[in-house]
């Protein structure tokens, strides 16, 4: 039995549009992304959220569907920290930008919290399994950190950087040093 996976991103309609390419390159550089596909994935997710908001805005303000689904959508965005709690109207969803989502990525927050020297170092730390969110070890740089989880961001207890077991190279060096010490005796 095969699964039907939905698309996670859309490629641009016009492949060689200078303004778009420059804007994407700026985002890739600023947030230390691997490729443009990461930008397109966020753009697609944002487009789906904005589409849902537009569909709800067309409905009457007293419509139960608009009230229920609108509050659920707003709650989701508030939890992610993409929108401030004070902005609790559907109109504000239409003003969201790709940067708002990029700011909530684990990679960006690791760098901004001072756990990494650069945005690229943050990605290396995450992929190297050195970062945890709460008690959960996370090795996905694009992981969107919730507001309540942000204060629990830190180095994993198993990481050599946090005083865990030394890494492969450190163990090898220690072994070499101990064998040299025995030869001298």
From Swiss-Prot:
Region (Disordered): 155-185
Gene Ontology CC, one term: nucleolus
Pfam families recorded: Ribosomal_S4 (PF00163), S4 (PF01479)
Protein's cellular compartments: Cytoplasm; Nucleus, Nucleolus
Gene Ontology BP annotations: ribosomal small subunit biogenesis; translation
Matches recorded under InterPro entries: Ribosomal_uS4, Ribosomal_uS4_CS, Ribosomal_uS4_euk/arc, Ribosomal_uS4_N, S4_RNA-bd, S4_RNA-bd_sf
Keywords (A to Z) from UniProt: Cytoplasm, Nucleus, Ribonucleoprotein, Ribosomal protein, RNA-binding, rRNA-binding
Domain of life: Eukaryota
MF terms (GO), sorted A to Z: rRNA binding; structural constituent of ribosome
Entry keyword Ion transport: no
Residues covered by the S4 RNA-binding domain: 104-182
Functional description taken from the UniProt entry: Component of the small ribosomal subunit. The ribosome is a large ribonucleoprotein complex responsible for the synthesis of proteins in the cell. Part of the small subunit (SSU) processome, first precursor of the small eukaryotic ribosomal subunit. During the assembly of the SSU processome in the nucleolus, many ribosome biogenesis factors, an RNA chaperone and ribosomal proteins associate with the nascent pre-rRNA and work in concert to generate RNA folding, modifications, rearrangements and cleavage as well as targeted degradation of pre-ribosomal RNA by the RNA exosome.
Subunit comment: Component of the small ribosomal subunit. Part of the small subunit (SSU) processome, composed of more than 70 proteins and the RNA chaperone small nucleolar RNA (snoRNA) U3.
Family: Belongs to the universal ribosomal protein uS4 family.
Stated name of the protein: Small ribosomal subunit protein uS4
Provenance organism: Dictyostelium discoideum
């Amino acid at each position: 039995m095969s699964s039907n996976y939905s698309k996670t991103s859309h490629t641009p309609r016009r492949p060689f549009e200078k303004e778009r390419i420059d804007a994407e390159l700026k985002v890739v550089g600023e947030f230390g992304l691997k490729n443009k596909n990461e930008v397109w994935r966020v753009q697609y997710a944002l487009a789906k959220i904005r589409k849902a908001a537009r569909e709800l805005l067309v409905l009457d303000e007293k419509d139960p569907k608009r009230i229920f689904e609108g509050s659920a959508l707003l709650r989701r965005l508030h939890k992610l920290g993409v929108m401030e709690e004070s902005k609790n109207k559907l109109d504000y969803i239409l003003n969201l930008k790709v940067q708002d989502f990029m700011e909530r990525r684990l990679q960006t927050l690791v760098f901004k919290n001072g756990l990494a020297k650069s945005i690229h170092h943050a990605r290396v730390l995450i992929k190297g399994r050195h970062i945890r969110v709460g008690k959960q070890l996370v090795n996905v740089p694009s992981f969107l950190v919730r507001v309540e989880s942000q204060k629990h961001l830190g180095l994993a207890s198993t990481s050599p950087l946090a005083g865990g077991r030394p890494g492969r190279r450190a163990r090898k060096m220690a072994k070499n040093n101990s064998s040299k010490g025995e030869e001298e005796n």
